[in-house]
Amino acid sequence: MRKRISAIIMTLFMVLVSCNSGGVAEDPQSKFLKSAIDLGNDFLNVFTSFGDIVSKVLGFSTETKKSDVGAYFKTIQDTIQGTKDKLNKIVTDMKREGNPNASATETAVKTLIDNTLDKIIEGSKTVSDAIGDASDPIANVGANNAAGVAGTGIESLTKGIKAIVDVVLGKEGNAEAGTDKKAEDLSARTAAGNGEAGKLFAANAGDDANAKKVAADAAKAVGAVTGADILQAMVKNGANAAADAAKANAKDGTIAGAIALTVMAKGGKFAGPTADSADYVTVAKGAAVSAITKALDTLTIAIRKTIDAGLKTVKEAMKINANDTPISPEQNTPKATTNN
């Protein structure tokens, strides 16, 4: 019996060897189907990278530095650049081997790169460069009697964010979302009046009692809008964001956008109270972290969805199953949660 089993195993081995040593060249189409599979794995790595990026964003805290936000955009830049390089290599290999789908694939890749990838890469670089190595915290509240500071590089931040938002969000989101009602009594906001979020950007936030109301109003504004609303407000108001947030009848979206820009800007800082107010500082910092987390979580997911759609078009041009996507934008992506 043992000899018989050994003979069967030897026969199977010889068959396998003969099948794999026939000297037959690999079929070009099979080779590129393999390339397509490899590309699919590359796509999976890209999407996994975006999941990691979102995880980092959701890990932002009052101790997070502005340079960490800059690093987020640098990671976006590098990740998209890697995708661009892989796509260009696929096209080069297809053309060299005379693949019949090379021309259509080249067109699809060029469209994706020109209309989407390059714009995200450039926008991310602009934002990252504007923030640089700023070591101050994102939730930066001034000392007692310190005025709010918009920070530097606002125009560059706005330019870079706009380049990305225009591609991945389009018109989604409303820069003037929410209401103009302040948290204290739901009356309309005045021009940075006492107890209003506009005081974050003023000469000071007021005494302890009023400063607490300022922080509560800021938290109300951020909580009332979406990440897309915040991004659109940042893009729309730009260098005027802080001033617009301090105007009468300022909407929640306007205030939240100004908070997010101040969080990102080098040297950006919220006004301090006129006297010690630990509660004001804590709640104001929380609103700042919430604003930037909402904005960047939304931005990352929108980038993923946009690139996923573009890669599907490339797969269609390569004549492979465009619906056989490694993972979808909604899969394996941490979502921000709120406690009711």
Swiss-Prot record:
It is a lipid-anchor. InterPro entries: Borrelia_lipo. SUPFAM superfamilies: Variable surface antigen VlsE. Keywords: Cell outer membrane, Lipoprotein, Membrane, Palmitate, Plasmid, Signal. It holds the Pfam family Lipoprotein_2. A lipid is attached at C19 (N-palmitoyl cysteine). It is found in: Cell outer membrane. A lipid is attached at C19 (S-diacylglycerol cysteine). The keyword Nuclease does not apply. Residues 1-18 form the signal peptide. Its main location: membrane. It comes from the Bacteria. GO terms for cellular component: cell outer membrane. PROSITE patterns: PROKAR_LIPOPROTEIN. The Vlp and Vsp proteins are antigenically distinct proteins, only one vlp or vsp gene is transcriptionally active at any one time. Switching between these genes is a mechanism of host immune response evasion. Genes for both Vlp and Vsp families are on (usually) unnamed linear plasmids in B.hermsii HS1. Belongs to the variable large protein (Vlp) family. Gamma subfamily. This is Variable large protein 5. It comes from Borrelia hermsii. The gene is vlp5.
